[in-house]
A protein has these predicted regions:
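H-loop/switch region of ABC-family ATPase nucleotide-binding domains
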Residues: 190-192
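The feature captures the beta-strand-to-loop junction immediately N-terminal to the Walker
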Residues: 38-40
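Conserved ABC nucleotide-binding domain
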Residues: 117-133
């Protein structure tokens, strides 16, 4: 059965003054898949995610979400969709503790999240710690937990796998895959390397200097990779 498109990009251009950040002729994302967006520093990964999240306005071109352009307010500001979640560790309020961030996002299930994602994985030591005192890896753990606990149609995570060890990445990967399987969430993950992405993303899009250099099929759900 053919998957429905959730994003459709045509002739996208993004510029910051005289600097070209993105120039993509055509790119489509389909509902319910996990996508990896890979590229070096300055390739346009973060800018692309922000445009797809409604955080950033393109200079030219068309970006459709479920067949429609993002709505804009009186001053041209994009009205964000409630069913799109964009996560960047730098967006988290560093003056709050981990507990306060979780409670702010999930007031009714704070203790459940503590037990499920922190106590179980020996991360309880960071629970009362302000974000500006935890490691980069712990910040990325927290942002991913926020993402998988929210029932979003689309989840976009910037810098996936950054500053975390392979064991922790496997744990987070399983949580993302579970969410994708159960809820059908479309997931877009950006990374400077395709090492982790190739192991579970359905499609990997490679960016180079703001252009799509190649698109490759990734992991197949029904493959024989089931050994434990």
């Amino acid at each position: 059965m053919e998957l429905k498109q959730i994003y459709d990009i045509q002739n996208l251009k993004l510029r910051f003054k005289d600097k070209k950040a993105l120039e993509i002729k055509t790119l489509k994302f389909h509902n319910g898949l996990i996508y990896g967006i890979c590229g070096n520093f300055g390739s346009g990964k973060t800018s692309l995610l922000k445009i797809l999240a409604g955080e950033l306005k393109e200079t030219n071109g068309s970006v459709l979400y479920q067949g429609n352009k993002f709505k804009r307010g009186f001053f041209g500001k994009i009205k964000k969709h409630n069913d799109i979640q964009y996560l960047d560790a730098n967006l988290l309020n560093s003056s709050l503790t981990v507990e306060q961030v979780v409670k702010k996002n999930f007031p009714k299930k704070t203790q459940q999240i503590k037990s499920r994602h922190f106590t179980t994985f020996q991360m309880e030591s960071v629970w009362k710690t302000p974000l500006n005192l935890i490691s980069d890896g712990e910040r990325h753990w927290l942002k991913t937990i926020i993402g998988v606990e929210k029932d979003q149609r689309v989840l976009l995570i910037d810098d996936y796998g950054l500053s975390i060890d392979p064991r922790t990445e496997i744990i987070l990967r399983k949580k993302i895959i579970k969410m994708n399987n159960i809820l059908g969430t479309t997931v877009l993950l950006s990374s400077g390397s395709d090492y982790f992405l190739k192991q579970f993303a359905s499609v990997i899009i490679y960016l180079d200097n703001g252009h799509v250099s190649k698109v490759r099929k990734g992991f197949k759900k029904n493959s024989n990779n089931r050994k434990k």
